[in-house]
């Protein structure tokens, strides 16, 4: 490229001789040079591979070419004589740099930005950037410079189009053209003639004037389609035209000689005459020593013809030459994906983007004036970060255990960092480098947000926008907490301190006020309460309070005394927190400033003085300054929390920061993993977390009642627990997986539990009728009673060194001990008021006493040396010592889990055995396990249980399936091993694996497209076709749905039907269902497609509520809840007998399992069974099971038999329903809304015949006229048009063909029957004044021979003599017309005969129709049936599967209209993208003049982009914007939507603010955070459906990510 440019540069020196320049122009994808004298030749590409080059200019003397790229939001340059030398000049803070101009004398770069509405200047390398103009600009575009005079010129095509002039230093601004101007695009200067030229793309002219705007003249007008950019060389004007895609030229004086220079340009943009002549030399006042300026020296039109200037935001000193060393006061701004700084020293308030990467969701921001770091929180990255004020030195400060950090505050004195977390509901502190972290407050916080510090006094203040909004204060160590304000608050988002006046200010986004009070909570008053719809970020500096507003997308400030307001920045979306600060000034001090107050870790200042504090896991020793890691400490649970106490320092107890603890009971730990485990008898869970409170999770959530005892197997990594309510001892892995019941027989209220994994034993206490202490191997075997004569023993603990057991006795108030066999029993301590928990460490035992509310210690052998460790503790439930010595030893399970696939359980003999999850069986290898294949499932209201009939197994367990609300019915797919159930609360059908994984909604609760709400009642699975048959209580139909959730359709529906219980027999192709019709309940059978319907029983029934089927024995069973009995019959309905009718109260479910019939009795809370062979009678299976709802037996699937079923492979080839016929072959069928096509495999839409047509049942002829129905001729191939023809009524005449006509039409002279039989055998006598036609018809005599045919047989015009002159001979035209008429008549007659008689019989086999249909089953139109035309096409039962897609037989059986609607039979589907419904194209004021480019102006694909350098905006060059459109959406704000806004995916109308559309469409990115009330990350995990205390926006951590709601809450649809 360099060689080409050098040659072109050399050629340019020939310009003076040739009087024609090289033209440099931007072509969007490249920059090109073309010879103006030979423009027809190809242009030379100067720079290629560009995104969207718009403006271009050059500095000829330096060999530099500059251009702006609006897609990359950058200004770049290249050098003539270097290859691939593209350099970035300006890459930040640009949005749409439309205009560009080079000052070749002062060596400066000027540009316009039509998005930011600024004109800026910088050095040629992009340094020392300064905003010259930022006010009264509205779409500035072209810019031209006259350095010799110090003036600059630019066009503005905004609402008030104009051309302005100003000094190049920003002075002497003046409008020179503001009339007869609309879209001023191109602009150029004639330096020799001192003229200004411009092009207007709307008014289609090129005008010129003097440089001051006077003496305006037209150069070219009327013949310019769309001029864009303009340049001049000598006497010739050159310009680009968007419409013609060319470069044109004319004489600059007269406009004559208009010609095309260069054509076929992809997208001609800016243009310049590339010549030294266009950049004449002149005196440069800045040429010597930069004019004495420290930074920028700008040309000026007034003496001394230059002006010193400073970069944006920096003040010029009084000497007029030197700039300050950066800004003094800054406003730091956090946006969603970038950070910005705004200087408060200068009036332009230009926002400068910090060059930082990977900002995902910045929220809060603060500043440390000592080291110059900015600190901010990122909600998506879940981290706290920092960088220097220029964006360099970026670091992550805190990354662990961060959920939603909404507030941040720097203690610049003690060098600490504080933050609030509304996810963990904590206030924490750490050093500024992220070390030495400590939780200060974790209780009674709902939604903490803003936080500010007063290090001089020692207080911190924060807001909480929870259910009871408040502003609180505490010392910097978290002590002395007090509520300052808790009334008349909504969403207190922002908080700021006035250190000088002792005031605290806050902004409330719900009450829309800014208020102030004294720091002690007194003197509250309102400062601002007008036009602040959604305040968020908040700060104070000097006399001003600053805030961000989400809805107004603005930053404003108000004077704290006068309340005068000023807008700092406007229309900037995604605004979050902000901080106003003095960059270098540090105020105040406290004792922590000197050597960290002498503290080894944290120095926290309080009003009473400093306090040294330790991070989590450390403890303060007696000097109260030094923190150490303790060797051992006590852990204890106290119902609402879990705490720790050092054994070395006897310091105060410290709560472990755990959320959601309701009633902690048993407690243990895993020392190698540094985790604690605890049971919660209120939540009925077992949970775990790290010692610092992080990573809290529930490991066991199902099937617990009162888990009072729990212990960790630290060698096998297993968890054991004893449940007093279920009377079981269970085990699982530490994460809750592979759960198994070890002991369940003869357990009576098991309580305390202790493990000895090294020896393979477990020990427990029982509190039942005969309290005792038992022992068993850790697999539950070898059970024995060690201590039989004991009271309610608790706190069971083991001294592993001395091999002794210790326990407290709640009945005798003793602490006792024995050896590991229960012998050598001793009393260690007596005279104890109420001992409860107990543990042992080294030479001491530690116990809790409920009466003394204390933790005490004594010698473990003598009970002497009693000491109170801690007092004032209520109801300490459990206690233990956290130390490695308490978890020592080894067994084989400690190595690779003993090579067991699931559980490794230590035993005393043999070392270990492999164990399996409940109901699994150990394989022959004694290592691996197999899942059960035969079992029972039964459901309760909010649980599904599995039961096996095995004496060696615990009978039932609860399956770990989440979110069960109201289980009504269950079924199981043995092939995929998935469980299906109906949730009657959510009205849906769901499925999941037995372990709760792979949850999926199969049938949703509504069908929006059909406006249907459903209520599934019962379900049954066809495992061969992979279908679910289910009844619906709302629509009273039987539906079929594929197991993957795709609908098949309705197979059974009737006007009086109320199908409820259903069971399928796919082996025979039938289904059985109860039909609870009013006054006549029935049990019916039908084929799986709903045909062959048959009532089996209609008598002796009251409310048959449950069905079961035994295909092996060929038996059907049902339970009648009203008659309270269970009956059976053959599958055909024969041999009906009553199986059981005694002591049955409320049977709700039946199933067959082997030779037994099982049922559940909801009222008796019982599962029972009866032997179907009659040999063993009735047996109770299990009792005391509340809220039973259904039961289902799962039998082992024989894969060989399964594969032999004809429907098992690809559904038998059927597209929809596969049925087995009696001979073992298959028959395909369809749901009711479809019919079977000719291939007898596929289902399709039935023919959409009009209401005036009859639908043939099958065959290639679909529709015939209704009049042909029952006319005696068979037009349909299957003769269905002549089947079941009605008998005529008494008032009708029946034609010979069977057709019925009105009796009055008989013998009226007109043949009304198709066979004319109504006019046969008629005896007619005409009156005297009448003429009798040959067919017997009577007409008036005056109508005889009147040249009008009145008799239907035309006999009235026969035998007539002429009475008039003969008509003239017909012309050829008349003859032609007659010929055409005759031809049409003959053709019609032939067509009629063919259609009626011949064609239907002659159609060949090879012909095809659109759809071919085959219907199985007889036509069954009753005699006497007279079809309505609107129902003829779809109501014939012989076509019971016939219905259009939009017919009344919807998938859920709803009724919405006639079976066939011709209006809907069009080529566009309901989802057609061509539909324009709802599309709104707003009126455009001053619309864009550009031609239709690649981008639709209505889709607005371009848009606002964050200015982060890491962001790439891919919109194309946007020449003109739409004006007067609504601003971009913002998170749902206040006022309009405080109560009932719901998030919507709808986008506002196309009328969005220019450039902001991309903010509405960032589907792949999260929407701006709330941090505002009631966002989706509410720490209470509540689900608010209305517009919350805050924009219901961003916290979409599950899922899906929606754009923020419009603001205010409008519906733009």
UniProtKB/Swiss-Prot annotation:
Q: Which GO terms describe its biological process?
A: canonical Wnt signaling pathway; cell-cell adhesion; cellular response to cholesterol; chemical synaptic transmission; dopaminergic neuron differentiation; endocytosis; midbrain dopaminergic neuron differentiation; negative regulation of smooth muscle cell apoptotic process
Residue ranges annotated as motif PPPSP motif C: 1568-1575
Q: Which residues form the signal peptide?
A: 1-19
The free-text tissue note of the record is: Widely coexpressed with LRP5 during embryogenesis and in adult tissues.
Q: Where does it localize?
A: Cell membrane; Endoplasmic reticulum; Membrane raft
Q: Which GO terms describe its cellular component?
A: cell surface; cytoplasmic vesicle; early endosome membrane; endoplasmic reticulum; extracellular region; membrane raft; neuronal cell body; plasma membrane
Q: What is the effect of changing residue 1529 to A?
A: No effect on the phosphorylation state of PPPSP motif B
The UniProt annotation puts the region (Beta-propeller 2) at 328-589
Spell out where the chain crosses the membrane: 1371-1393
Record-annotated LDL-receptor class A domain positions: 1248-1286, 1287-1323, 1325-1361
Q: Which residues lie on this side of the membrane: Extracellular?
A: 20-1370
Q: List the disulfide bonds.
A: 286-297, 293-308, 310-323, 592-603, 599-612, 614-627, 893-904, 900-914, 916-929, 1207-1218, 1214-1228, 1230-1243, 1249-1263, 1256-1276, 1270-1285, 1288-1300, 1295-1313, 1307-1322, 1326-1338, 1333-1351, 1345-1360
**Which region ranges are annotated with the description Beta-propeller 1?**
20-275
Keywords, ordered alphabetically: Cell membrane, Developmental protein, Disease variant, Disulfide bond, EGF-like domain, Endocytosis, Endoplasmic reticulum, Glycoprotein, Isopeptide bond, Lipoprotein, Membrane, Palmitate, Phosphoprotein, Receptor, Repeat, Signal, Transmembrane, Transmembrane helix, Ubl conjugation, Wnt signaling pathway
Query: Which residues are recorded with the post-translational modification Phosphothreonine?
Result: 1479, 1493
Q: What induces it?
A: Decreased levels on WNT3A stimulation.
**Residue window of motif PPPSP motif A:** 1487-1493
Q: Where is this region: Disordered?
A: 1556-1613
The effect annotated for residue 1487 to A is: No change in the phosphorylation state of PPPSP motif A. Greatly reduced Wnt/beta-catenin signaling
- Task of the protein: Component of the Wnt-Fzd-LRP5-LRP6 complex that triggers beta-catenin signaling through inducing aggregation of receptor-ligand complexes into ribosome-sized signalosomes. Cell-surface coreceptor of Wnt/beta-catenin signaling, which plays a pivotal role in bone formation. The Wnt-induced Fzd/LRP6 coreceptor complex recruits DVL1 polymers to the plasma membrane which, in turn, recruits the AXIN1/GSK3B-complex to the cell surface promoting the formation of signalosomes and inhibiting AXIN1/GSK3-mediated phosphorylation and destruction of beta-catenin.
What quaternary structure, including any partners, is listed in this protein's UniProt entry? Answer: Homodimer; disulfide-linked. Forms phosphorylated oligomer aggregates on Wnt-signaling. Forms a WNT-signaling complex formed of a WNT protein, a FZD protein and LRP5 or LRP6. Interacts (via the extracellular domain) with WNT1; the interaction is enhanced by prior formation of the Wnt/Fzd complex. Interacts (via the beta-propeller regions 3 and 4) with WNT3A. Interacts (via the beta-propeller regions 1 and 2) with WNT9B. Interacts with FZD5; the interaction forms a coreceptor complex for Wnt signaling and is inhibited by DKK1 and DRAXIN.
* Name listed for the protein in its UniProt record: Low-density lipoprotein receptor-related protein 6
Species of the source = Homo sapiens
């Amino acid at each position: 490229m360099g060689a080409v440019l050098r040659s072109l540069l050399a050629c340019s020196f020939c310009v003076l001789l040739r009087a024609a320049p090289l033209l440099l122009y931007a072509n969007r994808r490249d920059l090109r040079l073309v010879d103006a004298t030979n423009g027809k030749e190809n242009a030379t590409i100067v720079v290629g591979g560009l995104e969207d080059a718009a403006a271009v200019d050059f500095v000829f003397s330096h060999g530099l070419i500059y251009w702006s790229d609006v897609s990359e939001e950058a200004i770049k340059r290249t050098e003539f004589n270097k290859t691939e030398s593209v350099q970035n000049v300006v890459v930040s803070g640009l949005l749409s740099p439309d205009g560009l101009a080079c000052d070749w004398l002062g060596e400066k770069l000027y540009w316009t930005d039509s998005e930011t509405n600024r004109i800026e200047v910088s050095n040629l390398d992009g340094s020392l950037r300064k905003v010259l103009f930022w006010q009264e600009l509205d779409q500035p575009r072209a810019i031209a410079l006259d350095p010799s005079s110090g003036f600059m010129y630019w066009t503005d095509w905004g609402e008030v189009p104009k051309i302005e002039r100003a000094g190049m230093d920003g002075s002497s601004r003046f409008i020179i053209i503001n009339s007869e101007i609309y879209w001023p695009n191109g602009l150029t200067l004639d330096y020799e003639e001192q003229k200004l030229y411009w092009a207007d793309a709307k008014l289609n002219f090129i005008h010129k004037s003097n440089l001051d705007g006077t003496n305006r003249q037209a150069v070219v007008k009327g013949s310019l389609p769309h001029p864009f950019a303009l340049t001049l060389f000598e006497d010739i004007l050159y310009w680009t035209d968007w419409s013609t895609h060319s470069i044109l030229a004319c004489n600059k004086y007269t406009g004559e000689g208009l010609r095309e220079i260069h054509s076929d340009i992809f997208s001609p943009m800016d243009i310049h005459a590339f010549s030294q002549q266009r950049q004449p030399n002149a005196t440069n006042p800045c040429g010597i020593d930069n004019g004495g300026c420290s930074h920028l020296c700008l040309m000026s039109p007034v003496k001394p013809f230059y002006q010193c200037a400073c970069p944006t935001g920096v003040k010029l000193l009084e000497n007029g030459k030197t700039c300050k060393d950066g800004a003094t006061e800054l406003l730091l701004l956090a946006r969603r994906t970038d950070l910005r700084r705004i200087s408060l020293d200068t009036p332009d308030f230009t926002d400068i983007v910090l060059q930082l990467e990977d900002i995902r969701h910045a929220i809060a921001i603060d500043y440390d004036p000592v080291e110059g770091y900015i600190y901010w929180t990122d909600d998506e990255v879940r981290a706290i970060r920092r960088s220097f004020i220029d964006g360099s030195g970026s670091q992550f400060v805190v990354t662990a255990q961060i959920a939603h950090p909404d507030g941040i505050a720097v203690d610049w004195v003690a060098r600490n960092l504080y933050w609030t977390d509304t996810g963990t509901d904590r206030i924490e502190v750490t050093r500024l480098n992220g070390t030495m972290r400590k939780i200060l407050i974790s209780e009674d916080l709902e939604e903490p947000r803003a936080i500010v510090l007063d290090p001089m006094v020692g207080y911190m203040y924060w807001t909480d926008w929870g259910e009871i909004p408040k502003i609180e204060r505490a010392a910097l160590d978290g002590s002395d907490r007090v509520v300052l304000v808790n009334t008349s608050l909504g969403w207190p988002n922002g908080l700021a301190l006035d250190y000088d006046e002792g005031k605290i200010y806050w902004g409330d986004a719900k009450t829309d006020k800014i208020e102030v009070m004294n720091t002690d909570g007194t003197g509250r008053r309102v400062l601002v309460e007008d036009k602040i719809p959604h305040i968020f970020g908040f700060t104070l500096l000097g006399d001003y309070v600053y805030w961000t507003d989400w809805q107004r997308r603005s930053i404003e400030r108000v004077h704290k005394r006068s309340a005068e307001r000023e807008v700092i920045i406007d229309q900037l979306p995604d605004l979050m927190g902000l901080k106003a600060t003095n960059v270098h000034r540090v105020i105040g001090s406290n004792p922590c400033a000197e050597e960290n107050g002498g503290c080894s870790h944290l120095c926290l200042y309080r009003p009473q003085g400093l306090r040294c504090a330790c991070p989590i896991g450390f403890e303060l020793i007696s000097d109260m300054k030094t923190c150490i890691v303790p060797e051992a400490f006590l852990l204890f649970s106290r119902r609402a929390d879990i705490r720790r106490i050092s054994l070395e320092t006897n310091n105060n107890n410290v709560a472990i920061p755990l959320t959601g603890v309701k009633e902690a009971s048993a407690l243990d730990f895993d020392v190698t993993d540094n985790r604690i485990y605890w049971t919660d008898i209120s939540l009925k869970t077992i949970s775990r977390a790290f010692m610092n409170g992080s990573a809290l999770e529930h490991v066991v959530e199902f099937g617990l009642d009162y888990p009072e005892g729990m212990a960790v197997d630290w060698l096998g990594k297993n968890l054991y627990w004893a449940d007093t309510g279920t009377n079981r001892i269970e085990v699982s892995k530490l994460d809750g997986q592979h759960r198994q019941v070890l002991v369940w027989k003869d357990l009576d209220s098991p309580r305390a539990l202790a493990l000895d994994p090294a020896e393979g034993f477990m020990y427990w206490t029982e509190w039942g009728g005969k309290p005792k202490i038992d022992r068993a191997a850790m697999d539950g075997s070898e059970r024995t009673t060690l201590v039989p004569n004991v009271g309610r023993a608790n706190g069971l603990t083991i001294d592993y060194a001395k091999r002794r057991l210790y326990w407290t006795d709640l009945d005798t108030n003793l602490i006792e001990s024995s050896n590991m066999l229960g012998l050598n029993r001793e009393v260690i301590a007596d005279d104890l008021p109420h001992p409860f928990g107990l543990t042992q460490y080294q030479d001491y035992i530690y116990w809790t006493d409920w009466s003394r509310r204390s933790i005490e210690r004594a010698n473990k052998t003598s009970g002497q040396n009693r000491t109170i460790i801690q007092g004032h503790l209520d109801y300490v439930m459990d206690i233990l010592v956290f130390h490695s010595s308490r978890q020592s030893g080894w067994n084989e399970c400690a190595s690779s889990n003993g090579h067991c696939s699931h559980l490794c359980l230590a035993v005393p003999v043999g070392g270990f055995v492999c164990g399996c999850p409940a109901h699994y069986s150990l394989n022959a290898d004694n290592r691996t396990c197999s899942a059960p294949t035969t079992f029972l499932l039964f459901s309760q209201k909010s649980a599904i249980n599995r039961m096996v009939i095995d004496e060696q197994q615990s009978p039932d367990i609860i399956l770990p399936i989440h979110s069960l609300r109201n289980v009504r019915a269950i079924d199981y797919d043995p092939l995929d091993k998935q469980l299906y159930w109906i949730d009657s609360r959510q009205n849906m059908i769901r499925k999941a694996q037995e372990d709760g994984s792979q949850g999926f909604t199969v049938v949703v609760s509504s069908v929006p497209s059909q406006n249907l709400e459903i209520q599934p009642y019962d379900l049954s699975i066809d495992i061969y076709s992979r279908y679910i048959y289910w009844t619906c209580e709302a629509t009273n139909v039987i539906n079929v749905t594929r197991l993957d959730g795709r609908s098949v359709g309705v197979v059974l529906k009737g006007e009086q039907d109320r199908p409820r219980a259903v069971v399928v027999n796919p082996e025979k192709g039938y289904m059985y269902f109860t039909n609870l019709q009013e006054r006549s309940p029935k049990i019916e059978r039908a084929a799986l497609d709903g045909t062959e319907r048959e009532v089996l029983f209609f008598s002796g029934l009251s409310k048959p509520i449950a069905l079961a089927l035994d295909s092996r024995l060929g038996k059907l069973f049902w339970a009648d809840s009203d008659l309270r009995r269970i009956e059976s019959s053959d599958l055909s309905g024969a041999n009906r007998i009553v199986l059981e009718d005694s002591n049955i109260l409320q049977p709700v479910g039946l199933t067959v399992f082997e030779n037994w019939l099982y049922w559940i009795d909801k009222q008796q809370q019982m599962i029972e069974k009866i032997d179907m062979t009659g040999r063993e009678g009735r047996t109770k299976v299990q009792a005391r099971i509340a809220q039973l709802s259904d039961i289902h037996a799962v039998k082992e699937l024989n894969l060989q038999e399964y594969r032999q079923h004809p429907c098992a492979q690809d559904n038998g080839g059927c597209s929809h329903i596969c049925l087995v016929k009696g001979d073992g072959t298959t028959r395909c069928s369809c749901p009711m809304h479809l019919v079977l096509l000719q291939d007898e495999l596929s289902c399709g839409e039935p023919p959409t015949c009009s209401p005036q047509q009859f639908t043939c049942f099958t065959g290639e002829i679909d529709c015939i006229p209704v009049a042909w129905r029952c006319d005696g001729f068979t037009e349909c191939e299957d003769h269905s048009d002549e089947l079941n023809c009605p008998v005529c009524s008494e008032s009708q005449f029946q034609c010979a063909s069977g057709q019925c006509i009105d009796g009055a039409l008989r013998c009226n002279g007109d043949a009304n029957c198709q066979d004319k039989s109504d006019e046969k055998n008629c005896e007619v006598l005409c009156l005297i004044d009448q003429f009798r036609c040959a067919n017997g018809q009577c007409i008036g005599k005056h109508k005889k021979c009147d040249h009008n045919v009145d008799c239907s047989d035309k006999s009235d015009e026969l035998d007539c003599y002429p009475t008039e002159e003969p008509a003239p001979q017909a012309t050829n035209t008349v003859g032609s017309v007659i010929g055409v008429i005759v031809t049409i008549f003959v053709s019609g007659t032939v067509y009629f005969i063919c259609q009626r008689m011949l064609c239907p019989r002659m159609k060949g086999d090879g012909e095809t129709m659109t759809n071919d249909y085959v219907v199985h089953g007889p036509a069954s139109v009753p005699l006497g049936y007279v079809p309505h035309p609107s129902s003829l096409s779809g109501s014939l039962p012989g076509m019971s599967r016939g219905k259009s897609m939009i017919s009344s037989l919807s998938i859920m059986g709803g009724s919405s209209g006639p079976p066939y609607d011709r209006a809907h039979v069009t080529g566009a589907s309901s989802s057609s993208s061509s539909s324009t419904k709802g599309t709104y194209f707003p009126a455009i004021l001053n619309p864009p003049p550009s031609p239709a480019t690649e981008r639709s102006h209505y889709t607005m694909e371009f848009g606002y982009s964050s200015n982060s350098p890491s962001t790439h905006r891919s919109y194309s060059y946007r020449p003109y914007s739409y004006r007067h459109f609504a601003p971009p959406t913002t998170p749902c704000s206040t006022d309009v939507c405080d109560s009932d806004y719901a998030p919507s995916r709808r986008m506002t109308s196309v009328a969005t603010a220019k450039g902001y559309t991309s903010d509405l469409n960032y589907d792949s990115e999260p929407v701006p955070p709330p941090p505002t009330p009631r966002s989706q990350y509410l720490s209470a995990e509540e689900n608010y459906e209305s517009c919350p205390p805050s924009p219901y926006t961003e916290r979409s951590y599950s899922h899906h990510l929606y754009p923020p709601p419009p603001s205010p809450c409008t519906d733009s649809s």
